[in-house]
Amino acid sequence: FVDAMSRMMSPYDFNPLNINPLKDLIERFVDFEAIRNFDQLELFITATNVHSGRMRVFRREHITADVVMASSALPHVFRAVEIEGEPYWDGGFTGNPAILPLISTNGADDVLLVQIAPLKREDTPTTARDILSRVNGISFSSSLAAELRALVVGKRLLRELLPGLECH
């Protein structure tokens, strides 16, 4: 039912009052102050700016319920979430996950990536639901693939510019 509705109506049509019980639960059960103050671990959440199409990475210190909601706002199901006057959708469109901030901010030697959606599929989707699912999968995976390619190119350039440098 929701699947069919989301193809015929936008979330602005079928949820005119913008009621979202998930936000209420997040605000009630997540201690954002504790998250912001916990400096033993870095946390980044990504959202996609609707106007520019660019990724915005929110660091641990700036994470709020709105940031969490924006980072998971699929545009065919949820309204864009406004943060500082700008509308945001799911961060998966532009950074799924955003790897470069982890490396550039922390100088991490290693990053563990857990892939939750396959980049490749052997079957050809034939139903409307499967086609939409695959389109979303490709869209969400393309940002990761682009970042991985950028890392490979960066390592290659470093090796050429600094022959004695060891890159893993």
Predicted regions located by residue number:
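A short, Trp-centered hydrophobic/proline-enriched beta-strand micro-motif
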Residues: 43-47
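Non-catalytic peripheral regions of patatin-like phospholipases
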Residues: 1-25, 48-50, 59-63, 86, ...
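Active-site glycine-rich loop that binds ribose-phosphate moieties when present
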Residues: 23-33, 65, 69-80, 91-99
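Short, structured loop/turn "capping" segments at alpha-beta junctions
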Residues: 36-37, 78-79, 110-112
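A short alpha-helix-loop-beta-strand transition element characteristic
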Residues: 30-42
